[in-house]
Amino acid sequence: IALMIMFTVFNAFSAFAPTFNTLFIARLLSGLPHGAFFGVGSVVASRIAEKGKAAQAVSLMFMGLTIANIVGVPLGTFIGHNFSWRISFAVVVFVGLVTLLSLKLWLPALEATKNRDLKAELSFFKKREAWLIIAITSFGFGGLFCWISYIAPLLTDISKFSSEDVPYILILAGLGMVVGNFIGGKLADKFSPAKTVIYILLTMALDLVAVYYLSSIQVVSLTLVFLTGAISFAAVAPIQMLMINTAVGAEMIASAAIQAAFNIGNALGAFLGGLPLVAGFSFASPNLVGTGMALSGVVLVFIFIQYRKKVVKLQAIQTT
């Protein structure tokens, strides 16, 4: 609730900002709660979920993000273009107030974690498992950002769509993200978060190879836009649950760290994916880099699983 208050208040400042500098600062401040909100939200969703459905609960929470991308972004653009950018922010403030009221009315009271302070939670990052999961997220899912960072020129230069078609095609990616997010939660509950992440990253690698070789065929390209969006967001709930299950006693801060790891992956994917373009290769080439990043994530998950087994075995010996 506190994070939503911050989000709503700072967006209100944006709506009434008298100068560009004020608007810039207000936008910066309104973005601060983002990672913490989804980190805390993931933990809360997993705690209030039915037994065996924690990952599905997390995926439902993130489904709001995917739906917002499909509906909110074009709606905000439409309002800003036809009316005023200030009204766009006013709508965001209204949605924030509705969300606050909803949280107050329907979010159940959860018992706070006892005997934990910030120092104790930060100690989780002394563990190798924490950094392995962050690396899995940053490198493995950096493959997604190799694709999405250069999707517009891929669609226009390789698939030969017009630039006017691109915004509508991206709706397909958004729809795929909604579907994939839901499927990923079910898979993580059925199997395990670690195994699910492996399956998704392997599928992502194959998908990006297909994007590289087949995007010149328009019908196939459209299909791959949907599939790539679905595959990429199928990973969100499993990787969150992998971190939550590993960071016992430090779930909140560890879950928020995943959001930072995704942002690192965003930067890495855009940078590494751009290198072949600088070297003169086609706009399909970033997807081969993305394939390599996805496969590197698979290797890191296997390393995590083996290391985790050793830790659990050692803990079992110490308690006997």
Q: How would you name each of these model-derived features?
A:
Residues I1-A12, K195-V209:
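Structural signature of the two symmetry-related core transmembrane helices
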Residues F78-V93, L275-A294:
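A membrane-interface helix-boundary motif in multi-pass transporters
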Residues M6, F10-F13, N21-S30, V219-L227:
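Paired small-residue
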Residues V93-A112, L300-I305:
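C-terminal membrane-cytosol helix-exit motif in multi-pass small-molecule transporters
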Residues N245-F283, G290:
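A late C-terminal transmembrane helix in Major Facilitator Superfamily
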Residues G180-S192, L277-V278:
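Helix-to-loop junctions at the C-terminal end of transmembrane segments
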Residues F16-T22, K160, L214-S215:
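Helix-breaking motifs and short loop linkers at transmembrane-helix boundaries and internal kinks
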